[in-house]
Amino acid sequence: MTYECFDLTIEDGIAHLRLNRPEKANSMVPSFWKDLPEAVNALSRDASARVLVISAEGRHFSSGMDIAVFTEGGLDGPTGGSRHVKAEAFRHHCMALQDAFTCLEEARMPVLAAIQGASVGGAMDFITACDCRYATKDAFFSVHETAIGMTADVGTYPRLVKLIPEGWARQMSYTAERVYAEKARDIGLINEVYDSVEEMVDGVMAIARQIAGNAPLAVSGAKRMINYARDHTTADGLDYIAVWNASMLDGEAIRNPFMAQAKGEKPEYEELLPVAKTAGE
């Protein structure tokens, strides 16, 4: 299937989604908000990839929401009715945009973002929903909505405050300043900084291969447990992992890879099964 704003390939268990509108700084046009969750949810449903890498062509990862959205009434919401019923309808419109990125967080496979140049506005909503983020040394990050008189509403605030120290989340949000890659790594937004796009993509793909080489059920379970633990107490997290393993731990599935590793052989793991609909959809 083809998409307007990105290309998608799958090889050796690694899905690679490349934003492909470099001439427009990979801005997010209306079709992006439909196509991204469609593509990610399809990967998650059919279990065709063990990991998803997201990168971008051109100088910038993404400049966020396309300018047409702001200049052609895209933020005005539904027409007709009183202010109150329009506001209620706009809430659903906003939540649909939020779902376009929440699908990354809810996907059965890990999602790795490789970022160069600008990651501003809606792109911050985008990358904070990914599992891990990597950047080139020229990359910068900005909650730019504040500078245009808007409170970011598609996911930045609830996720950013759980990724970096609260003081930095507040400073970035209040000032709309640019935080460059080295500082972003220092505060925990970025895992690693690379000298060039080529080095970054090679490095992220190497990490993706490591992930793809592990048991899909264990990796998917780890993602689920980390997401749950982030949003719950330690006691809740311990209880959930105990229930999870009580139902999904397979002794034979562990013994076989263990024995293969002991013999210096490459372990083989059972793939996740395709499903009609994932829990996050």
What role is predicted for each listed range?
Residues 17, 21, 36, 54, ...:
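Terminal peptide-recognition signature
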Residues 56-99, 149:
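Glycine- (often His-adjacent) and acidic-residue-rich active-site loop
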Residues 1-57:
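Conserved CoA-thioester-binding segment of acyl-CoA-metabolizing enzymes
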Residues 1-3, 258-281:
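Terminal low-complexity tails and localization/encapsulation signals of metabolic enzymes
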Residues 58-63, 120-121, 226:
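Short, active-site-adjacent cap segments at secondary-structure transitions
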Residues 31-35, 96, 103, 203, ...:
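Charged catalytic carboxylate motif
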Residues 134-139, 190-239, 247-250, 269-280:
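C-terminal long alpha-helix characteristic of the crotonase
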Residues 102-217:
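Crotonase-fold acyl-CoA enzyme core
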